[in-house]
């Protein structure tokens, strides 16, 4: 008989994988047709608030996931992590769909993502053997890539480092691994996925630094 906790987390895992596969297609289709709807109603206040509210909800889940893992409550940790991850599939999409993108949302969305992942990794490092090394590699990669993006943005080359297929696959395996590990569904499988995610993190990070070589070269060639 399947445990209810396993059923819940399995369904959430399938939703995360489906989001990773389908959301890019939805986004591309939306960009293809967004200019065709020239006559649309102005967004309501509710529509303006919803995307940022979802992002704020994800931020609010961060201490709950951490506390649940520290208090040995895997069911709460798994469910809260799954819910927080699913909101990531909708806040950005709804903001684009309703054309209510904001600077605050653009800032908070990646912050919420990274806080959720890093905090969960820290909590798992203290309670799950074997997590420390891949967690350290993933966190180091995130710090390096964040610094790279800031460097490129300061030089007016924000689009010089674009997320590719390896980065999206890294995110999908990372979220799946953390979901399995927080719920303690299959520790060996979860640890294996986390190691794969760490390898993809290093590989995709190296690709981003390779993309940014022209920015570094232009900076070196600049006078003064």
Task: Give the role of each language-model region.
Residues 2-28:
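N-terminal chloroplast transit peptides
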Residues 65-73:
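Short, hydrophobic transmembrane alpha-helix segments
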Residues 21, 25-29, 33, 39-49, ...:
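A feature for the membrane-embedded catalytic helix bundles of lipid/isoprenoid biosynthetic enzymes
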Residues 78-85:
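Short hydrophobic/aromatic, small-residue-rich stretches within specific transmembrane helices
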């Amino acid at each position: 008989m399947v445990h209810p906790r396993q059923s819940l987390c399995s369904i959430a895992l399938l939703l995360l994988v489906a989001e990773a596969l389908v959301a890019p297609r939805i986004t591309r289709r939306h960009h293809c047709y967004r200019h065709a709807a020239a006559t649309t109603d102005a967004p309501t206040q509710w529509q303006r608030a919803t995307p940022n509210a979802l992002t704020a909800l994800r931020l609010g889940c961060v201490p709950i996931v951490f506390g649940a893992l520290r208090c040995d409550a895997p069911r709460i940790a798994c469910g809260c992590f799954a819910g927080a991850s699913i909101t990531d599939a909708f806040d950005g999409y709804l903001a684009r769909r309703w054309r209510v993108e904001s600077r605050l949302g653009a800032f908070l969305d990646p912050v919420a993502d990274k806080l959720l992942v890093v905090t969960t990794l820290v909590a798992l490092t203290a309670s799950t053997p074997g997590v420390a090394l891949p967690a350290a590699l993933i966190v180091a990669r995130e710090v390096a890539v964040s610094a790279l993006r800031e460097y490129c943005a300061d030089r007016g080359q924000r689009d010089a480092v674009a997320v590719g297929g390896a980065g999206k696959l890294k995110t999908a395996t990372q979220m799946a691994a953390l979901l399995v590990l927080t719920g303690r569904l299959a520790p060996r499988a979860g640890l294996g996925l986390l190691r794969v995610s760490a390898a993809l993190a290093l590989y995709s990070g190296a690709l981003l630094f390779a993309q940014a070589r022209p920015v570094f070269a232009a900076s070196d060639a600049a006078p003064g």
